[in-house]
Amino acid sequence: LHPFKKPIIKHSMSEKKLNLLADFPAVSAQEWMDKITADLKGADFNKRLVWKTNEGFNVMPFYRAEDIENFPTTEVKPGGFPYVRGTKANNDWFVRQNIVVTDAKEANKKALDILNKGVNSLGFKVDKNALSPEYIATLLDGIDAECVELNFQTCVRKSAYLMDLLVAYFAAHQYDVLKLEGSINFDPMNSMQLKGKKLAKDDVMEMAKNIVLSAARLPFYRVIGVNAVSHNNAGAFAAQELGYALAWGNEYLSSLVDRGVDTSLAAKKIKFNFGVGGNYFMEIAKFRAAKWLWALIVEAYQPACRRENCELTRDGICYCAMKMRLHAETSAFNKTIFDAHVNMLRTQTEAMSASLGGVHSLTVLPFDAPFKAGDEFSERIARNQQLLLKEESNFDKITDPAGGSYYIETLTKELAAQAWKLFLEIEDKGGFFAAIQDGSVQAALTATADKRLKDVSSRREVLLGTNQFPNFNEVAGAKVSPVAGCGCNDGAATLPVVRAAQEFEALRFATEAAARRPKVFMLTIGNLAMRLARAQFSSNFFACAGYEIIDNLGFASVEEGVAAARKAHADIIVLCSSDDEYADLGVQAIELTKGQEILVIAGAPACADDLKAAGAEHFINVKTNVLESLKGFNALLNI
């Protein structure tokens, strides 16, 4: 063919269009099941292919169109009630970065800088003792409040004062209040859970009423926070986070209405701050279900519409008030100190879940947040993770791509059912305030955190770089510094302060602090494939505690391997071979190491009982609890 001429193509059967539905016979669900059953060759379908989630429902290996027939979510369009597909027709979201304000002028300088780098939402954590008109003027100098979402957090007892300062500042600068968007994160119930403070409900709700009435002057400012992110950071499963959040929000809404606040106004002043974790599709479903269920809750109050010519008013009912305002922040629970750059991968998938799930705004925390304040590099990466999704991947141009997905629609429905069940349980017991007062919410989340830590310790829940495939030579060094606890606890129950990686990290910190780093020697011998596989497994196993790993290609005899281990001054010798060879090689290793090195046999051989009788004490395999085993070795090594 000439390189600059189109080839001549003769058309015949290729002109016929392929019709997949007509040209291929339909396959029924039963036919799929029959095929799967045959391929399993007698293995249990439920054990092998059905995912038993922590959310209280099972996930099947495949779904079909008939599985989502008559779902209440599938006929809804983006922007339509009950908003499962989003509260607006587009999927644009605010890119938020938080600033802890220690000096108003410096914070303003930083805010102006990052606004020129892609941020369009600012989160200021302000000092309650510094609040004044001059402080706000300095903090917001040069920032166009009509173009930037402004969010604030301060002491709950100063929140109403902060609201008044903002109203006065906006009026002085002649801003159009209909173009101002932002929030004040007033949430005393969050303080009760985090700090163990004992507050009276009447006092809390009276403060809430005052700030809501003050904020009525700013129609698009939300001033009541529902900080479900605190539950997420404490290890909550998605159904728990959502169910408690609904009860939390309803506690504020019902209490405000009971105190005479207009229902529509009260609902429009509540903002939900969720965490977003690494369970990718479940998180997308969580945000979809959250918008759906909150719309149903607010609808039950029949809020009256106060706006003239509102397109969403039906029979005088305000459907705008039923739209959840949803902010998301990447979870702290699954972030790690060691191999911290993996946190970038975690926050990237979390940002994807949140954006595809239709959040209003999103904060991606810097990858180094577990051990230090973000610096210029880590904050830039965190911003760019969102900008990449917008500018390169166009996630903001596609609204609810999960809509119609057999899998995600099913997850949404099932997760909503579990969350609704929990919501009703809380309501039946007197509401969310009562549940945190008696400590039942904190107790439930502590139990969940304990389960997740146990799953991490046994590798049922994997943290790359921490309990699986660690960086063998990484040293924490100056990464870790002590964190002072809050001194304002009144003795009430609190949420667990926990990260999934913390117990493994404690092992490595202890190893670093030891006088000498333990050496683990891989005595590889016999069957090539098995010895390599078990050496790799064992190396990863012991590296999780920060031990020095000495791997080897193989030895001709156990004697040669033990001699090499002693020459290397090994503390632990791991025998890596095949099950069939352990009956002989294991006994030899036991005799040669007795009373000197710690001998570990990699695997679960059939001859394990015989080896134990001969003196073997330590075996590691895929069923071993990694954390507890490593704690035991630390104890043997006096670490």
Model region roles, listed by residue range:
Residues 52-61, 113-121, 342-368, 403-407, ...:
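Conserved phosphate/anionic-ligand binding catalytic regions in large, soluble enzymes, centered on
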